Structure formats: structure tokens, C-alpha cells
Amino acid sequence: MAAGGNRDGEKRGSRSQADSGFLGLRPTSVDPALRRRRRGPRNKKRGWRRLAEEPLGLEVDQFLEDVRLQERTTGGLLAEAPNEKLFFVDTGFKRKEPRKKRTLVQKKSQRLQKPLRVDLALENHSKIPAPKDILAHQVPNAKKLRRKEELWEKLAKQGELPRDVRKAQARLLSPPTPKAKPGPQDIIERPFYDLWNPDNPLDTPLIGQDAFFLEQTKKKGVRRPQRLHIKPSQVPAVEVIPAGASYNPTFEDHQALLREAHEVELQREKEAEKLERQLALPTSEQAATQESVFREMCEGLLEESDGEDEHEAGRAGQPEAGDGTTEISPTGAAGPEKRMEKKTEQQRRREKAARKLRVQQAALRAARLQHQELFRLRGIKAQVARRLAELARRREQRRIRRLAEADKPRRLGRLKYQAPDIDVQLSSELSGSLRTLKPEGHILRDRFKSFQKRNMIEPRERAKFKRKYKVKLVEKRAYREIQL
């Protein structure tokens, strides 16, 4: 048994030595023939997957990848390469010849002959030639074109040239006259007109036609409103930043800008503290109790009830003071209803005379007052002058207020305009070079805020997405109980 086992081992060892002729470039490259492969079912996908995941399958993949790498880099396997390709004979140190100094022109020409790095990166460094595409070298209608070339060669010998060659020769003999290119003066002198001008030349054919017809057929231009000729704000489109925002500002300008930014932050903190103070929860000492809530609810009710009690007590004591019979006035509501008696002629004459006398007295009083107004003419003039001066003062105040608010953004929507933060850098962040300067702000955000400040668009906020619930279909019970 032992001898047989040794014989089998010698056969296996000799087979391994015969198969191991592979030289790998990587230190992990191992000849797969040195390992004994495990047997397993290969007629199912499970066996294929297991074979690929086993160490032997991984080594086979690594072996094939190493073979491809050698073919790409050296043009073949290292085991098959001759000794002259792998080794060289060292004959000793070679003495370098002194290099001649090159002129600037020679250096420049050599630099121009040297290929660029981008071209070297795009070159094919693989030793394996690319597969030849036969279709790329095929020419459609090659036989037809070859016959046509033979025909034209035969005609050229007879002195007849193709049509395109004859046209080219004719163009050379009689070249076309070059067209004059329009210069800058021609472009400036080109007629132009104002689109909103009332003397528009395009409206000349429409003069004398029916205005209603032109309006209905959309041939009449839209009249530009006068308000569109006025700018909504006098703020310049591009504002010059303060001197302290420069990349190399003076000490005074930078400190002034820092002070301005500091005041803005202080104002913002005050508003935040005020809001927090208003929304703060009360302490245990300030918390409302049941007694304080009841006292607040009864506030004002107890005083009114006390006054009513005193008033009722006074009314109740009045009949006790006079024990006699109380006389009720004839006009009182508690007395018997009085019958309306017919007026006599004498009473009617007296009432008519009294009315006439009152009218005469009112007319005399108005005439007397009008006569007295003549003596108050100087006072009236002074009063009118004071009123006119007051109106002029108010008018001037409104004009000054409008001028002061001309540069301020108006409220165009439900949101107020919020000024952007001041772009400022601390003293430690300043740099004397534009290359190392830390960027501040954003050009798109700056333009958007400029539109809002100049009253061209309203202040906006980010749209809030509303949650949409899934539609749920419910069948009513009365409908569900109906069975057909």
C-alpha cells in the first residue's frame, strides 16, 4: 500500500511539475494546475455558481486576468518570451558625452515636436492589436465607382473632362465679383423707430380706417400706459458696495462697515428677545390660579350690582316720605289717558303769529350777524391765511416724506422686504490678494434682492408643499345593505 501510494504521489508530482510553466507578474499569481480541483455537479446553475465562488474558480479568474495583463504590457506570456527580451548583458558604466548647449530656437522647436500629455494619454498602450473591422474598410458601390473611374480615365484620354472639373475651371477663368460687406456706418444709418412713439411708420397704412374694426381685428397696437414710463424706484440697478467691503480696505472704512453690521445684529437680537419675552411661559408665581381666574371673570359685575341696589333702595324710600295721596301729572304714563280737544280759532291765530314772529326774529338775527361779519373781515383773512399755511406745511411734509420713502421698498404683497445680510469679513479673514480672498455673497441672490428692493417683484418665500392624503373610498351602510 505504501509503495502504491508513493507511486501515485510521484505521478501526481510529475504532472504538477509539467503543468507549472506559468510566470505571473503579480506576487499573488498562482498556477491553477498546482491545486487539486474539487469535483461537484456541473449540470446545474448551483454548481456553476459554487465553482466560481470556490478558491479554484477565483484563482482561474485571477490567472486569466494575469494572462491578459501580460499580453497587453509585453505582447505575450513571459514564460514564452526569449532570454534576449528578458535579460541584457551589463558591460559596465557608459561614459556620457557632454551635451551641447542648445539655443532658444532649438529648445522651442524640440518642445513643439514633443507630443502633448493629453495626446499621450489617449494613445493605445496595449500590445494587442485592435480587431480589424472588415465593414469599416468596405466601400458601398465599390464596383460601380471603380467602373465609373475607369470610364472617366478613358474619357480623359480622349480630352473630355467631368462636369464638376469643367465648372471649377470656369470659375477660375471668370471669378465672381465679391459682394460689398456692410460696414458699421451702414448699420448705424439703418432706419429705426420707437415702438411706442405715436408717429410710428407702421401705423401709417391704418390712418383713416375704422377704430373699432382695427381694435377687433387686433391690427391696432396696444397703447403703452404712462405709468410704465416711470421707474418704480429711484434706487440704482447696481449699487456700489461700501469701501469697507474691499479686499484691501483702509482701517477706518473696515471698522465703519463692521460697526454697521454689528448694529444690524444687535437690532435682530432685540427683536428675537422681545418675541421670546412675549411668548415666554409664566413662572409659578405668575401662573393663574382658580381664584384669580374667577376674579377676572367677575370684574365689573359686582360694582354694577351695588349701584343698582342703592338706586332701588332710594326709589323704595320715596313713597314712605310722603304719606298723603300722590298726585300724578296729566302727562305721566301711569295717569289716565287724556282726550285730545279740538283747538279754537283764537289758539290757531296765536300759534300762527308766534311762528311768524320766530321767523322774523331769526331773519333779524342772521342779518345782524352778517353785518357784524364785516367788522371781522381782518380776523377772517388771518384765519384763512393760517389755514392755507397749515395746508402748505402738510403738503410740504408729504412731499418730503415721499422723497424720503422713494428709495425704500414698498409693500407689494403679504410679506415685507427683508434687507440681505451685509457681506463683511473680519480682520483675520482679510487677504491682500484676490487669489486667496474668501468669497462672500452670491450674484444671483444679489440680483434677486435688487429686484425686490426696486419694487419690480414682490418679496417671496419658499413654497410649502401641502401633504396630500390618499383618497379613501367608503361604501355607505345603507347602500351596502341593498342586495340585488
UniProtKB/Swiss-Prot annotation:
**Skewed-composition ranges (Basic and acidic residues):** 336-348
Where does the protein end up? Nucleus, Nucleolus; Nucleus, Nucleoplasm
Q: Where is the composition biased (Basic residues)?
A: 35-49
PTM info = Ubiquitin-mediated proteasomal degradation is regulated by c-JUN. It is associated with relocalization to the nucleoplasm and decreased homooligomerization.
Tell me the residues on which Phosphoserine occurs: 29, 305
Q: Which residues cross the membrane?
A: none
Q: This protein's superkingdom?
A: Eukaryota
MF-aspect GO terms: 5S rRNA binding; identical protein binding; p53 binding
What is one process in the GO biological process aspect for this record? Answer: regulation of RIG-I signaling pathway
- List every stretch annotated Nucleolar localization signal: 353-401, 402-484
Disruption outcome: Knockout embryos are not able to form viable blastocysts. Transgenic mice lacking the expression of Nop53 in the thymus display a dramatic reduction of the number of thymic cells and of the size of the thymus.
- Region: Disordered; residue ranges are 1-51, 304-356
Assigned GO CC terms: cytosol; fibrillar center; nucleolus; nucleoplasm; rDNA heterochromatin
Q: Which UniProt keywords apply?
A: Acetylation, Nucleus, Phosphoprotein, Ribosome biogenesis
The record's comment on protein family reads: Belongs to the NOP53 family.
Q: What does this protein do?
A: Nucleolar protein which is involved in the integration of the 5S RNP into the ribosomal large subunit during ribosome biogenesis. In ribosome biogenesis, may also play a role in rRNA transcription. Also functions as a nucleolar sensor that regulates the activation of p53/TP53 in response to ribosome biogenesis perturbation, DNA damage and other stress conditions. DNA damage or perturbation of ribosome biogenesis disrupt the interaction between NOP53 and RPL11 allowing RPL11 transport to the nucleoplasm where it can inhibit MDM2 and allow p53/TP53 activation.
Q: How does it assemble?
A: Homooligomer. Interacts with PTEN; regulates PTEN phosphorylation and increases its stability. Interacts with RPL11; retains RPL11 into the nucleolus. Interacts with CDKN2A/isoform tumor suppressor ARF; the interaction is direct and promotes ARF nucleoplasmic relocalization and ubiquitin-mediated proteasomal degradation. Interacts with NPM1; the interaction is direct and competitive with MYC. Interacts with NF2 (via FERM domain); the interaction is direct.
Name listed for the protein in its UniProt record: Ribosome biogenesis protein NOP53
